């Protein structure tokens, strides 16, 4: 029985770790912590849109769209258990990050961003949750590629 639900432990463990880390870094940022270097600055920006401030014209309505999308993904994953079992850590990271950004939208009116990468070019300001979402998508893609290769090898 315990082995059957191991993926739930991994999902919620990743969810809580990413959520807590993102909120902790955001709390340091909101408390005024700043740092500058040649490549990366820790600063403060409030993003009222999504990536690269897209959809910021939706203003406060964006948080309800964000809530609906996260809700649909939660329902879909718990309905499609095989997908959740296969990618439990990645989806835990993704949803922990998404819920952390959603909390920001309700509390601060936008998402708290702090990392500004600026060596040779000015990249968008981002946060820990954004990094975790990108890592989780990369994990899912890598797992799917290796799963397909393993399946193809068995057919040979």
From Swiss-Prot:
Disulphide bridges, residue numbers: none
InterPro entries in alphabetical order: Peptidase_A8
EC class name: hydrolase
Subcellular location, principal: membrane
Transmembrane segments annotated in the record for this chain: 5-25, 64-84, 89-109, 122-142
Taxonomic superkingdom: Bacteria
Pathway: Protein modification; lipoprotein biosynthesis (signal peptide cleavage)
Catalytic activity reported: Release of signal peptides from bacterial membrane prolipoproteins. Hydrolyzes -Xaa-Yaa-Zaa-|-(S,diacylglyceryl)Cys-, in which Xaa is hydrophobic (preferably Leu), and Yaa (Ala or Ser) and Zaa (Gly or Ala) have small, neutral side chains
Pfam families: Peptidase_A8
Gene Ontology CC: one annotated term: plasma membrane
Localization: Cell inner membrane
Catalytic residues identified in the record: 113, 130
UniProt membrane topology term: Multi-pass membrane protein
GO process terms (BP): proteolysis
GO molecular function: aspartic-type endopeptidase activity
EC numbers on record: 3.4.23.36
Key words, A-Z: Aspartyl protease, Cell inner membrane, Cell membrane, Hydrolase, Membrane, Protease, Transmembrane, Transmembrane helix
PANTHER family: LIPOPROTEIN SIGNAL PEPTIDASE
Family per similarity comment: Belongs to the peptidase A8 family.
Function: This protein specifically catalyzes the removal of signal peptides from prolipoproteins.
Protein name listed in UniProt: Lipoprotein signal peptidase
């Amino acid at each position: 029985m315990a082995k059957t639900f191991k993926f739930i432990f991994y999902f919620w463990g990743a969810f809580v770790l990413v959520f807590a880390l993102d909120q902790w870094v955001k709390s340091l940022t909101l408390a005024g912590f700043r740092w500058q270097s040649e490549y990366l600055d820790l600063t403060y920006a409030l993003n009222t849109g999504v990536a690269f401030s897209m959809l910021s014209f939706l203003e406060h309505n964006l948080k309800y769209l964000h809530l609906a999308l996260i809700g649909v993904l939660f329902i879909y994953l718990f309905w499609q258990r095989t997908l959740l079992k296969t990618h439990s850590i990645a989806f835990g990271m993704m949803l922990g990050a998404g819920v952390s950004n959603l909390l920001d939208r309700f509390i601060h009116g936008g998402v708290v961003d702090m990392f500004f990468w600026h060596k040779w070019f000015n990249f968008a300001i981002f946060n820990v949750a954004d990094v975790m979402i990108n890592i989780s998508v990369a994990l899912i893609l890598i797992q799917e590629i290796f799963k397909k290769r393993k399946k193809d090898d068995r057919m040979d």
